[in-house]
Amino acid sequence: MEFKYLVFIVLCQYLDNTFFSETEAITTEQQSLSTLITPSLYVTTDSQNTAGNALSQTTRFKNISSGQQASPAQITPEQATPAVYVSSSPLTYNITRQAESAVNNSLPQTSPSGFTLTNQPSPSTYNSTGQPPKHLVYTSTQQPPSPAPTSSGKPEVESTHNQPTKSTPTIYLQRDTPPPPPPPLTSEPPSGKGTAHKNNHNAIAAILIGTIIISMLVAILMIILWKYLRKPVLNDQNWAGRSPFADGETPEMCMDNIRESEASTKRASVVSLMTWKPSKSTLLADDLEVKLFESSEHINDTSNLKTDNVEVQINGLSEDSADGSTVGTAVSSDDADLALPPPLLDLDENLPNKPTVTVVSPLPNDSINPQPSPDGLNQVCEEQHSKIQEPFPPPPDSFNVPLSAGDFINNQESAHEAQCQEFSTPDLHPDLTDSLPPPPTELL
């Protein structure tokens, strides 16, 4: 099937739609047919069903005078728009057999205007007459229909009714004036399973990374708080030890804190850092020296205690001699360098049996103090011996026999005296000087 028949069928369908319109629209459509038949046509088909869709698609052409523009036909956005281009240049065209079969199937259609295929005029051939096209029809998928002016000057609004499932071919007619710029097309992002899967994976990865970071921060905070609470801060005022200017002893709490701090710190000896280590012999020698030093200190302490006791005894004897209760022997200054007498024995055991004789070195103050007379000293000694040798009173014959008032008083007094003698401490200093010879007359 040739291309001219296809174009004729399209024009017939267009005329069918125009006959139902007003009379003014019919006159304008007839003029547009005369202008569209003169130039040569160039048709490009994108698929096998393009010709069939073109046969069933209704297209509205408008008669436009020279210098006027044609309004685009409205097409639904879901339909594909294969381009149909009309050129004035002589070109040779090859029609595929698929298009021919599609057109042959559409031949039984009849045109409502009464024209048949045999009545097609000859100017619709392949070769163009060389006349430049004067009009251009541009079909857009988004531009709304616009009113088309007629030769009488009255605009007419015409709309095309397209089938929602078929593609509409776009016909371009060249003209001298440049066409208006096409409107911007908004392309929707393709939505499919691939993009959905990618979005899901990205969201899952973001959630995992966020949970990991949050869990790490929480764990770090918990560790810091645990360490801070495990070691409470001690408000110790004596953290540096006992102050050298402090008066008195440190309290028990401070001492406990100091001991704990000392126990916690580990001290290393300097000997462990030395290359030379002391042997066992040197250690033993050091131990012996320490022991000898301690023993010498102990001996010195005991000797000092003995000398202190002797000095105390000498002072006591000098005081007693000043009171006239004791008799001391005067020793010349030549005998002052003699050794001290041996320590005194237990006086309690030897006192009643044998009086001890001691030689006491006189003090320098003793020579100044006057000595008591020997008669007075003898009387005092006799009184003390009589008191010590006095026997205890005999016990009563029987406790059942009642005693008289005088006997009872005497018994009480005797018991009281016995208890006093029993618990009283005897004066030892006079007993020590009982057997001493009288002092020389030079000192008197």
Swiss-Prot record:
Signal sequence extent: 1-23
In-chain residues carrying the UniProt-annotated modification Phosphoserine: 269, 272, 279, 295
Subcellular location field: Membrane
Region of interest called Disordered, as start-end residue ranges on this chain: 104-197, 318-337, 361-444
Bilayer-spanning residue ranges: 204-224
Sequence ranges on the Extracellular membrane side: 24-203
Record-given protein name: Protein EVI2B
Function: Required for granulocyte differentiation and functionality of hematopoietic progenitor cells through the control of cell cycle progression and survival of hematopoietic progenitor cells.
Protein's organism: Mus musculus (Mouse)
Biological processes annotated in GO: myeloid cell development; negative regulation of apoptotic process; positive regulation of granulocyte differentiation; positive regulation of neutrophil differentiation; regulation of cell cycle; regulation of stem cell division
Gene name of the encoded protein: Evi2b
Compositional bias annotation for Polar residues: 104-131, 160-171, 318-332, 361-370
Positions bearing carbohydrate: 63, 94, 104, 127
Tissue specificity as recorded in UniProt: Expressed in myeloid and lymphoid progenitors and increased in mature hematopoietic populations with the highest levels in granulocytes.
Any single GO CC term annotated in Swiss-Prot or TrEMBL for this entry: membrane
Membrane topology: Single-pass type I membrane protein
